[in-house]
């Protein structure tokens, strides 16, 4: 079960887009280690386009097109405008209202959930590039872990990007736990933020173990599951 509801996610989204926006007062040419070939400006352009794409989906039964960023528009203002439009549309609409989504349920609330980890992970990408230490709310990170297990991996499998996993990897954060795959099981206990970054391949298993995570069961099992195409 997710630790957040629609209203809680919207509050977190407001905070996350504001935190990402503050990154745009730094060096826009700083390389982003988590996204090879991108700098902070490229990352912000990507995220701003995703926000606008999601906003378009809220009022459509069909997949919207990605719109390019006009080259003459200042990046920080363009990002802020798109983020504000997304938050405003989500706040104005019933989370149960039908719309196009990447995966069931095909309702507005899907995007309220999807855009939070999207923004959180990219904020985590941007801040180290600017020498700023990132942090994440534990419940928000746990909601993102649940989304990978409940939405992203099933979608990857349905699209033929990932076959069924022959091993299982259980992820634990305190009393919360999630299981990926089936069969021989490894169990990793770590803070939810580390688990989220691990699933989105912003951390390696070695990184989180060095930071104090505890692994029981075969390490090879954990590595096999984590190497899979769990997310796009």
Please state what every model-predicted region is:
Residues 69-78, 139-155, 215-229:
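Short, mixed-charge aromatic SLiMs
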Residues 18, 26-65, 103-158:
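Short, contiguous alpha-helical
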Residues 6-14, 37-44, 72-80, 109-113:
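Amphipathic, non-membrane alpha-helical segments in soluble helical-bundle scaffolds
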Residues 59-111:
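Hydrophobic/aromatic-rich structural module bridging two neighboring secondary-structure elements via a short loop
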Residues 185-232:
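C-terminal interaction segments
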Residues 1-25, 230-232:
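Actinobacteria-biased recognition of intrinsically disordered, low-complexity terminal regions
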Residues 137-183, 187-188:
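Hydrophobic protein-protein interaction segments
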């Amino acid at each position: 079960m997710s630790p957040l509801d629609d209203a809680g996610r919207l509050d977190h989204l407001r905070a996350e887009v504001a935190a990402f926006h503050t990154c745009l007062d730094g060096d826009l040419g700083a390389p982003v280690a988590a996204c090879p070939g991108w700098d902070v400006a490229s990352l912000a352009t990507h995220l701003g386009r995703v926000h606008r794409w999601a906003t378009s989906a809220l009022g459509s039964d069909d997949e919207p097109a990605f719109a390019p960023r006009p080259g003459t528009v200042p990046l920080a203002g363009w990002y802020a405008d798109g983020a504000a439009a997304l938050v405003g549309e989500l706040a104005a609409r019933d989370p149960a209202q039908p719309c196009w989504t990447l995966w069931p349920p095909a309702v507005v609330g899907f995007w309220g959930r999807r855009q939070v980890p999207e923004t959180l992970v990219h904020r985590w990408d941007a801040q180290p590039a600017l020498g700023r230490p990132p942090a994440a709310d534990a419940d928000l990170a746990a909601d993102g872990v649940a989304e990978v297990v409940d939405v992203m991996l099933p979608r990857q499998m349905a699209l033929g990007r990932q076959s069924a996993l022959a091993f299982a990897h259980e992820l634990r954060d305190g009393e919360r736990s999630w299981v990926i795959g089936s069969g021989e099981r490894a169990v990793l206990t770590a803070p939810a933020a580390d688990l989220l970054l691990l699933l989105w391949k912003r951390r390696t298993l070695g990184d989180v173990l060095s930071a104090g995570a505890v692994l029981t069961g075969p390490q090879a099992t954990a590595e096999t599951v984590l190497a899979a195409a769990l997310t796009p």
